[in-house]
Amino acid sequence: MRVVLASRNEAKLTELRRILAASGLSVELVALPDGEEVAETGTTFAENALIKARAAADQTGLPAVADDSGLAVDELSGMPGVRSARWSGRRDGTRVERDEANNALLLAQLDDVPPERRGAAFVCAAALVTPAGVERVTHGELRGVLLTEPRGQAGFGYDPLFLADGQTRTNAELTAAEKDAISHRGLAFRDLATLLREVLTS
């Protein structure tokens, strides 16, 4: 069964293929074909995930999955939240350059914040939408703290700054398998894989 991921982000596609395969789900996850970007107008991760999954299912006629994920920083009252990928305001350059700009701004905003007040959570809402109108949403969260400088070369986004509770290495220093086992996206998509199996076999 083919399922479309409502994203053209290759890093995310690779990550979700690993997670779904490890869940024992036999699906071919394909990237969203080229076309107009869908405006993420929701105010919550769940709303944005559903917006993207609905658009992908409409565009392709296939069951679609999408996620909206981000970083919620305690000291910033939950921001950057749904604006995590656009936090710095930079829209040009490569994804790596935009990630670096986001990280630099976040570090500047937390410059004088002591370690005990640098708590944060990675949050993910994962959505499944079928052409028949079935809609499901699952959630995952990973708590941790933000460091004062980036560490590690793996991962993407805010991974180099994020030290998950119980870990001695940042998300960007973990192997792919280690990160998948604890990540917010891994938690949400493992639950979604169960729903996907039920929907596709019903």
From Swiss-Prot:
EC identifiers of the protein: 3.6.1.66
Reactions the enzyme catalyzes: XTP + H2O = XMP + diphosphate + H(+); dITP + H2O = dIMP + diphosphate + H(+); ITP + H2O = IMP + diphosphate + H(+)
InterPro entries according to UniProt: dITP/XTP_pyrophosphatase, ITPase-like_fam, RdgB/HAM1
Obligatory cofactor(s): Mg(2+)
Active site, per annotation: D68
Description of how the protein assembles with itself and partners: Homodimer.
Role played: Pyrophosphatase that catalyzes the hydrolysis of nucleoside triphosphates to their monophosphate derivatives, with a high preference for the non-canonical purine nucleotides XTP (xanthosine triphosphate), dITP (deoxyinosine triphosphate) and ITP. Seems to function as a house-cleaning enzyme that removes non-canonical purine nucleotides from the nucleotide pool, thus preventing their incorporation into DNA/RNA and avoiding chromosomal lesions.
Name of the protein described by the UniProt record: dITP/XTP pyrophosphatase
